[in-house]
């Protein structure tokens, strides 16, 4: 087995990385950042997302394991004090596997060029200096005309991130669905929207066609990364044929993660 390590530069993280490297070397597990079988991220959910984008070209061949140096994350199963147990499991135990859907974006520019992107959490479109005006289509059928700050399309795992702060629903990651949420929509007689998050089935897709003009300048974000372009003809969003896979050696129920992250019930109520 070959592993790659992806980590942030925090002091507590670097200490965990140093200890983890010693454990892996002692167990004769090769650290290979070029062609790994497993990518271990040390940090938080943001670090895991960075690891996904670093190795997305290998996403069909590799699995991910997340070590959290803070509280338990949505993508990270292990805490920093559990790395001995994690390495033991790597060498002795057959893991179960969990796969989560990814979001595919196809951006078509005004010149007809196409750019394909993948996102683990979400993608947004905004206008740089003015209000975004765009027509929204579902399965290539017109749905609504939007005016506002922007639109966000998220995966089920991304539903606990930016989408939730926009009023979106929290969706279990076993559901292959996409969710679109509005960012500060403006409704009038010309631009009328549902003014509610929508969730679409895995065989459906969303197309956003921004209003075109000489002074257009749009920013498309995907998991915090940016694609800037002056003229965007349309963006298609759909569930990707690719998935991200995680090695699971210990199970934490999704709703327990949600409760721990957002509610934090006193233990005497459990």
Curated annotation (Swiss-Prot):
Gene Ontology annotations of biological process type: NAD metabolic process; NADP biosynthetic process
Transmembrane segments: none
Active site: 45 (proton acceptor)
Keyword Transport belongs to the record: no
Keywords, alphabetical: ATP-binding, Cytoplasm, Kinase, NAD, NADP, Nucleotide-binding, Transferase
Source superkingdom: Bacteria
Catalytic activity as recorded in UniProt: NAD(+) + ATP = ADP + NADP(+) + H(+)
InterPro entries given in the database record: ATP-NAD_kinase_N (IPR017438), ATP-NAD_kinase_PpnK-typ_C (IPR017437), NAD/diacylglycerol_kinase_sf (IPR016064), NADK (IPR002504)
Names of required cofactors: a divalent metal cation
Cellular component aspect of the GO annotation: cytoplasm
Top-level EC class as recorded in UniProt: transferase
EC number in record: 2.7.1.23
Localization annotation: Cytoplasm
Binding sites annotated in the UniProt record for NAD(+): 45-46, 121-122, 147, 149, 160-165, 184
GO molecular function terms noted in the UniProt entry: ATP binding; metal ion binding; NAD binding; NAD+ kinase activity
Gene3D superfamilies on file: Probable inorganic polyphosphate/atp-NAD kinase, domain 1 (3.40.50.10330), Probable inorganic polyphosphate/atp-NAD kinase, domain 2 (2.60.200.30)
Family (UniProt): Belongs to the NAD kinase family.
PANTHER family on file: NAD KINASE (PTHR20275:SF0)
Its job: Involved in the regulation of the intracellular balance of NAD and NADP, and is a key enzyme in the biosynthesis of NADP. Catalyzes specifically the phosphorylation on 2'-hydroxyl of the adenosine moiety of NAD to yield NADP.
Protein name: NAD kinase
